[in-house]
Amino acid sequence: GRDGDEVPSYVAEITKNTTLGCKYFDMKNVNQIKIKTRGYANGYFEVKTKWDGEVYGKIPVEFTNFWTENIAEVNIPDGISALYFTFKGDGNCSLLEFELL
């Protein structure tokens, strides 16, 4: 949504093999990633720095009808890179936000 909207924007209808890409981040000592999701999905998000690159972590996602935080350990090399989240599993979910920890 627009700046100041009361309702937050999010990515909806994420299904099997959907990939979301975000550019660019200065990765320094990133050891975990936290995401906030909801929906009727069971699986995980692969975390990569390239569309078809190495998987640096997997963030679990389960069925829930309210926004839920999930955290996973990641092993992302230091440096400036993009982030790609690819959903692997069944059903569909929405992604509200993510945080590098």
Model-derived regions, located:
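Extracytoplasmic
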Residues: 1-101
